[in-house]
Amino acid sequence: MMGELALRYPGNSLVVSTGAYPGAAASDAQFPQIVDRVGIRATRLRTLQGLAAWTWRAGRLARRTRPRFTWCGELKPAGYPARWLKVRHGVPYGVIAYGTELLLLDAKIHRSAFKRWTARQLLGQAAVVVAISEWTASLARTVLERLGCSALARGVEVVPLGTTPEHFRPGVDPRDVRARYGLDGGPWLLTVARLEWHKGIDAVIKALAGVRAAHPGTRYAVAGVGDRRPQLAQLARDLGLGDAVRFLGAVPDADLPALYNAADLYVGASRRHDLLAEGFGISLVEASACGLAVVGGRSGGVPDAVRDGETGILVDPDEPAAIAAGINRLLADAALRQRFGAAGRRAVETFYNWDRVVKDLIRIDAAFRLPAPPAAR
């Protein structure tokens, strides 16, 4: 998300402060903004050394560029240098909230007075909290109320995420991707996600037997990596579906538009699992951008990504029978799939896109940023 901000904020109006990684220089060349990288790998910014280096570097950057507002792409670790800039330079900051980090934070502030104090210093001192879905916003309000930050809770803003309709679009030739990933025959269901329990891939595998009873030959492609692949593959074999479920592994972003176009239906049956949940469901709007009808789990922030009865169907993600029923309904009705897919594409063109997201964020930061310094005479 922060990369999209850096690409789409008006040129020279934003300075990006972040960690280093191999190949960063080539990546930074695409941005119209100044990108200032701390001399520490991004994966190490959460360490004490990383936080100290980032905070010092951000302070030096602030003295040079005189920022009027700071966006934190996540509460931790970005909240630490942002809080320091507020204390030392009076720069207000906004925090973008996704969901899972708030579930974890809520659990911690119940157990630890120190965690509550830290949360008040980082989250509670923000000028504004922006949530990526209504579900995330509700969770943010709950956490803020528990921290005694009622005014901030009342001001939580909701900015649903988007995608890039120029990249994800209908009509991309899928033949090469079909051949490369072995997606012959069909119909094909598709999920693009990390292989974790809260993504609901296991529930879709369980639903697949009921789908194949009504629509023989239906198969399920899963693009992504994660720790649960062995268990998910074993589940498919145990259910006699080993040949019907294809794990594609990591799929390059360049291949994703063709992969979506190779599928007949997208399924994103995410659900709450322990302290993990789906804050929005960006792959659902990527699928919509490609003209695919979608089946989404009625859980977390997914209802903000799927317009039930317009761009797809929402189902109970904890019930494989409900997932199967939603899939069967759409596989049985090509006209309905086409209507949902076309509506999804329109929704991306008019709302679920990064240009709209950035406009919303510019509008929000304009309400909190410091006044512009007087013009030099």
Positions of the model-derived regions?
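A short, active-site helix/loop in glycosyltransferases that binds the activated sugar's phosphate group
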Residues: 20-22, 124-158, 163-168
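Short hydrophobic beta-strand element within catalytic cores of glycosyltransferases
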Residues: 284, 289, 293-296, 306
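Nucleotide-activated donor-binding/catalytic signature segment of Leloir-type glycosyltransferases, i.e.
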Residues: 230-255
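N-terminal subdomain of nucleotide-sugar transferases
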Residues: 1-39, 372
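Acidic donor-binding loop of glycosyltransferase active sites
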Residues: 244, 261-276, 292
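Conserved donor-binding/catalytic core segment of Leloir-type glycosyltransferases
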Residues: 130, 183-199, 205-208
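Conserved acidic donor-binding segment of nucleotide-sugar-dependent glycosyltransferases
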Residues: 307-309, 313-320, 329-335
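Nucleotide-sugar donor phosphate/pyrophosphate-binding loop at the beta->alpha transition
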Residues: 50-53, 89-94, 102-125, 138-141, ...
